[in-house]
């Protein structure tokens, strides 16, 4: 097969998440709760050869467009990812993910004694203290969180 040939078919409407760090595609699907239960066609390609990086993962989801919360999750898991919005088989928007200064409601604090894990139903707020290293800190209890062990709300 020539390199210019498509390995997976194009989508008519939806989102293509490209340049996902190698081996993170499944984690991205889980974090974004993309499982096909809504009837959307999902294509995932793992360990695809890449010019920029040695390998990458790609996810295509028909009839789904990411919300800001989804983009923030993606920025933590796969900081080099790009989000491509497709309409009528054409690229209408392309953007790189980037971490905001704070992330609200998406992740749970790993500290069992944190007020956000109490019965009071307080929404979590994570401050991004190092965008390059993807280091988050709970605003309520100051616990520094390992991005590889985050739990999603």
From Swiss-Prot:
Keywords assigned by UniProt, alphabetized: Metal-binding, Pyrimidine biosynthesis, Zinc
One Pfam entry name: PyrI_C
Annotated InterPro entries: Asp_carbamoyltransf_reg_N, Asp_carbamoylTrfase_reg, Asp_carbamoyltrfase_reg_C, Asp_carbatrfase_reg_C_sf, Asp_carbatrfase_reg_N_sf
Gene Ontology biological process: 'de novo' pyrimidine nucleobase biosynthetic process; pyrimidine nucleotide biosynthetic process
Gene3D superfamilies on file: Aspartate carbamoyltransferase regulatory subunit, C-terminal domain, Aspartate carbamoyltransferase regulatory subunit, N-terminal domain
GO cellular component, one term: aspartate carbamoyltransferase complex
Protein name: Aspartate carbamoyltransferase regulatory chain
Native organism: Nitrosopumilus maritimus (strain SCM1)
Taxonomic placement: Archaea, Nitrososphaerota, Nitrososphaeria, Nitrosopumilales, Nitrosopumilaceae
Gene: pyrI
